Amino acid sequence: MAVAVASGFWIWAAVLLVPAAAVYEDQVGKFDWRQQYVGKIKFASLEFSPGSKKLVVATEKNVIAALNSRTGEILWRHVDKGTAEGAVDAMLVHGQDAITVSNGGRLMRSWETNIGGLNWEITLDTGSFQALGLVGLQESVRYIAVLKKTTLTLHHLSSGHLKWVEHLPESDSILYQMVYSYGSGVVWALGIVPFSHVNIVKFNVEDGEIVQQVRVWTPWLQHLTGACGVVDEAVLVCPDPSSHSLHTLALETEWELRQIPLQSPDLEFGSGFQPQVLPTQPSPVAPSRAQFFLQLSPSHYALLHYHHGAVTLLKNFPQATLVSFATTGEKTVAAVMTCRTEVQKPVSAGDGSVASFPETSGAQDSLACFNQTYTINLYLVETGRRLLDTSISFSLEQKGTRPEQLYIQVFLKKDDSVGYRALVQTQDHLQLFLQQLAGKVVLWSREESLAEVVCLEMVDLPLTGAQAELEGEFGKKAAIQDGLLGMFLKRLSSQLILLQAWTSHLWKMFYDARKPRSQIKNEINIDTLARDEFNLQKMMVTVTASGKLFGIESSSGTILWKQYLPNVKPDSSFKLMVQRTTAHFPHPPQCTLLVKDKETGMSSLFVFNPIFGKWSQVAPPVLKRPILQSLLLPVMDQDYAKVLLLVDDEYKVTAFPATRNVLRQLHELAPSIFFYLVDAEQGRLSGYQLRKDLTTELSWELTIPPEVQRVVKVKGKRSSEHVHSQGRVMGDRSVLYKSLNPNLLAVVTESTDVHHERTFIGIFLIDGVTGRIIHSSVQKKARGPVHLVHSENWVVYQYWNSKARRNELTALELYEGTEQYNATAFSSLDRPQLPQVLQQSYIFPSSISAMEATITERGITSRHLLIGLPSGAILSLPKALLDPRRPEIPTEQSREENLIPYSPDVQVHAERFINYNQTVSRMRGIYTAPSGLESTCLVVAYGLDIYQTRVYPSKQFDVLKDDYDYVLISSVLFGLVFATMITKRLAQVKLLNRAWR
């Protein structure tokens, strides 16, 4: 009974006495920041009015959002599933309603665009989604037409209720791709049999009855979408590059295609290019405009006019980048973006400042604009005449990128002239919102490639000039070269520099104290970057999936530099390595990015300065073979750059840098350099040893049967982590020594059988040097996804228990015992005994999106697990709660060690969330880095959003808190000094008076 009471007491103590990680209201945003993104635009709709303040977008990240057109901030956002089920297939905006179709045509939703509220949601029948259209009747839009592979359905716009559904004739052989209506009481469905004929079915809007069905032969046409368009009053126009002509068909009256040859010699179809008709329909209750664009090649457009069976050329654009239509009131304009060949004073897309680039580009490539300067002009669609004072010129910072999408927001000014704004999206996922304002063309910009961060590193900022001068005093070279007198003079000069810096800092403090807080500018630019006192401010080097690199200042989230890799394919993999830090002044810091193309397996290296974002003058080696593994060795060259080893598919090693000094060191250290390779498809893990001639030798091999289980994750320890304590003091005052094997690999496997009764998760702890299996365990009736953290002497991994239908965490800890085998040096080749492995499992009440452990400079601070939840919260869980040594029944020794009694449930307390309400949508990873304070760990969580903060696993034991009352303690000290002086004087007077007596 007493044991039960004691156990209950300890459980309640563990639950109630939890370390709080909350923040006060005045601390919100002081040490942390969050940046929200929506992703690359897939569909967009801009309001056509002068006072419009929002634009509605649907993105490739399955996000529907509204952006403030004045600032670019997100007004509201809805994040759907990250899989294909949440993909937005189509979006239409009418008035205050945005209609979206997602999940392959399974869900249709209506959104209120002002506040983002859901008006209605309906589930559609199964079938391949093809097209979406608005259907007008009697000068009002009432219905939504949904075209699928076999059916055409009509739904009420106000409620989403089904009006009628009709099966399409011969849908098993005809591929229906287009739907069209213009308020005449009918709706057309257009389908095609490739290289055969086009089938046109006409439905009555009221009852869905088939009014007419027409079949026309088109032996030259393969697709309707991406080729044909409907112009004027229901006239289908299809280009035919083989006959250099256009084919038209009036859907109301004609039964055969009419061929119209293109008479102009300037209208030549591009070789191997599928020409495309780009029409515009300003209103669903009105016919399409008779004017349309014909795209003849990737950069050649022509504005044509259809009238009574004839097509006339209004304007030819042989070198156009993008085109778009826009309508306001009764005016419809065409926007054309072209590359500006002569650049005088373009406006930079970064900050809007005017710069001079007097250059003239040569012959233009079909898609490239070598000077990266573009111009947008408006043209009247009726005549093709360019409108005066409608030109906007802008330039892109990054070379190799180009605009991909153009959306126009046009409106009428007070003098009845046309004004407009433009939304441009580039190849590197940059969104620019442009306006007609001299000096500030770029109203705002958004770097949406940051919604897909793939790897991240934090680099220490460089020292200031005064700090570098002070550091240089203590070098060995300085002592030899300068001598005693020279060092004394250098000390005086450095102290004068520090005094000058301190004086300017005081002056700035007094100057800012006279201003309101809102007017104090703490702008951070790349020229004033310097390491702070506690090294809390760092440079976040971020690599995105689009091939864009960013340098972000960690304390504010300010983007200081960016670079774009133009030839990176979408599915490439990246690995970022810091070869030289800022600690080796005057040598600049150096980062190396390894990019691997998954299709070809070929890789390339990019070397750059992580502080300034400039490409390095050091030429990396050209990689002619696919790279299997890369290793960053602690070996340095004469310029303090770590050596990078690259292993190709022939198991040959390339060193970078490959100087004579490096090759000599590799020749000496080759017997102690080992690495491993993983072939997940074959289930093979191989260990190799480096030879002195930079070839490799197979040292061990382990095969996991791929027909039974597959390798899903292999993770080693972080090379930068420090372990402060070699063991744990037990209750009897003995020491339980940790098994700190730096070569240990944690390998996670998952069964190939998907039946819930036969699934399992396996974990192997393997020595990467010898291939020895240190430990293996199997979790039966479990499946992934598995999240793993491997640090010090412990491993924590999460999985789904399919039998109990819950998420579980399993913790493993490795110990050598009460006697340490070798305290001075570790060797995998000299370990006769296997370590003791302790294991314990816990129930976690939520699934996990990402998991990482905190890290500090010396490893003294207690470790916490940072767990990203699907809700976007980040839980800071003390590692002590996942201690495998937690006893079921507490003993005197366990109480002496402060071990919490074992309880299988891990409670999630809101006060342990380090990001309070700053949730991170669709979190993919958490990155941790040490700071100059042992108590502080820097954390970056990334996914659709980016969130940066600081955590204090053991509280702030090495720095004063923010609420420390300096005035009070100073007053007390001055009061004590003053009281001491008065008391001393009174005591002297008293002694003098006593002496006179």
UniProtKB/Swiss-Prot annotation:
One MF term in the entry's GO annotations: membrane insertase activity
Keyword flag Disulfide bond: yes
Bridged cysteine pairs (disulfide): 228-238, 339-369
Keywords linked to the UniProt accession: Disulfide bond, Endoplasmic reticulum, Glycoprotein, Membrane, Signal, Transmembrane, Transmembrane helix
Keyword Endoplasmic reticulum applies: yes
Location(s) in or outside the cell: Endoplasmic reticulum membrane
Signal peptide (UniProt feature, chain positions): 1-23
Lumenal side: 24-966
Superkingdom in the source lineage: Eukaryota
GO BP: protein insertion into ER membrane by stop-transfer membrane-anchor sequence; tail-anchored membrane protein insertion into ER membrane
TM ranges: 967-987
Topology feature Cytoplasmic, residues: 988-997
One annotated Gene Ontology cellular component of this protein: membrane
Residues with attached carbohydrate: 917
UniProt topology in membrane: Single-pass type I membrane protein
Protein family according to the UniProt entry: Belongs to the EMC1 family.
Job of this protein: Part of the endoplasmic reticulum membrane protein complex (EMC) that enables the energy-independent insertion into endoplasmic reticulum membranes of newly synthesized membrane proteins. Preferentially accommodates proteins with transmembrane domains that are weakly hydrophobic or contain destabilizing features such as charged and aromatic residues. Involved in the cotranslational insertion of multi-pass membrane proteins in which stop-transfer membrane-anchor sequences become ER membrane spanning helices.
Oligomer status and interactors: Component of the ER membrane protein complex (EMC).
Protein name: ER membrane protein complex subunit 1
UniProt source species: Mus musculus (Mouse)
